[in-house]
Amino acid sequence: MANRAYLEQKQTQCSIINSSFSMTHRDLPTLTLSGKIRVMVTFFLFLVSTAFNASFLMKLQRQTQKKEEVKKLTRMKVLLKHLTLANLLETVIVMPLDGIWNVTVQWYAGEFLCKALSYLKLFSMYAPAFMMVVISLDRFLAITRPLAVKSNTKVGQSLIAVAWFLSIVLAGPQLYIFRMIYVEDISGQTGNFSQCVTHCSFPEWWQEAFYNLLTFSCLFIGPLLIMLVCNAKIIFTLTQVLHQDPHELQLNRSKNNIPRARLRTLKMTVAFATLFTICWTPYYVLGIWYWFDPEMLNRVSDPVNHFFFLFGLLNPCFDPLIYGYFSL
C-alpha cells in the first residue's frame, strides 16, 4: 500500500495521450525488508484463510447431503454460507494480488488486468462487509419481528441478493479510474517502470475525495454503524424480555420467545461485529490520515503501514473460528 500510495503522491504531470509522468530513479518504490515480511505473512494468511473457510463450506455441504434425505440448511447457516463464500473470494483475490504485487513492485499484467483485478479486489472487499450487515439485520429482525420473519421465508434471500448486487455495482467505478502509467526519466524518455494507479482519473480533486469517502463509508463506516445499531437494539430487546419474565426464561428457555439456540447466534453476531471493528479500524484510520495529510507517508514507517494492512487480512481468517466456537 505504501509504495503505490507514494508513487501516486509523486505524480506531477498528467498526459492523457501516453499516460506517463516524470520521476527520478531513486523515487521509484522498491521491495524493502518489511515488504518481504509482509509478502510472507500475506501468503501464510492466504493458506490459513483458504483452509478454514473451505473446511466450513465442506461441513455445510455434508450437512445437506445426508444419506437418508437431503436436508435444508437453516436460514442462519445459509447466511453463514454466503459470508464464507465472500471471505473465500476476498482471500483468493486480495491476498495473492497484494503478495505478488509487492514482490514485483511494478505492474506487468497490462491495462485489462489492471482494471479487472482492481474491480475484483474492491468487489471482494465489499461482499464480506455487506454479508456481515445482512447477518446483523437478520438477527435484528428475528428478535424484534420474529413472527414476520418466520412467515416470510424470503427475507433472508432478498437481503443476500441485495448484498451481492451492491458489491457488484459499487465496485464498478474501479474499471474506469484505474489505468496503467509509465515512468519517464528526467530526459523525457519513457522508462521500463509501469504501475496500475488512478493517475489523472479525476479532473477535480474534490471528485477523488468524494469517491474515496464513498468507498470508505460503504466498506467500513456504513457496515459498522448498521451492525452497532442492530446489536444495540438486540441487546435492548433482550434486556426488556429478561426483566419482564425472568423466572419463565430460566425455567423453560426452549419455549420462550428467545430460545437458547437463538441466543447463541446473537452472541456470534456480536463477535462478528467486534472482529470486524478490531481488524479494519487501524487500516482505515491510516487511510483517512493519508487523505488529509499525504505527507504522513514520510513520517510513518513502512513496517507500520504493512502491519495495519495485514491486520485487516485477519478478518476472513478468524471468521471460521467464530463459527466453530459457537458450534453451529
Swiss-Prot record:
Keywords assigned: Cell membrane, Disulfide bond, G-protein coupled receptor, Glycoprotein, Membrane, Receptor, Transducer, Transmembrane, Transmembrane helix
Gene Ontology MF: a single term: peptide binding
Gene name of this polypeptide: GNRHR
Glycosylation sites: 18, 102, 192
Role: Receptor for gonadotropin releasing hormone (GnRH) that mediates the action of GnRH to stimulate the secretion of the gonadotropic hormones luteinizing hormone (LH) and follicle-stimulating hormone (FSH). This receptor mediates its action by association with G-proteins that activate a phosphatidylinositol-calcium second messenger system.
Residue spans crossing the bilayer: 39-58, 78-97, 116-137, 165-184, 213-232, 282-300, 307-326
Cytoplasmic side: 59-77, 138-164, 233-281, 327-328
Any one Pfam family match given in the protein's UniProt record, by short name: 7tm_1
SS bonds (residue pairs): 114-196
Protein name: Gonadotropin-releasing hormone receptor
Keyword flag Membrane: yes
Similarity comment: family membership: Belongs to the G-protein coupled receptor 1 family.
A cellular component term, taken from the record's GO annotations: plasma membrane
Location in or out of the cell: Cell membrane
InterPro entries associated with the record: GPCR_Rhodpsn, GPCR_Rhodpsn_7TM, GphnRH_fam_rcpt
Extracellular membrane side: 1-38, 98-115, 185-212, 301-306
Alphabetized PROSITE patterns for the sequence: G_PROTEIN_RECEP_F1_1, G_PROTEIN_RECEP_F1_2
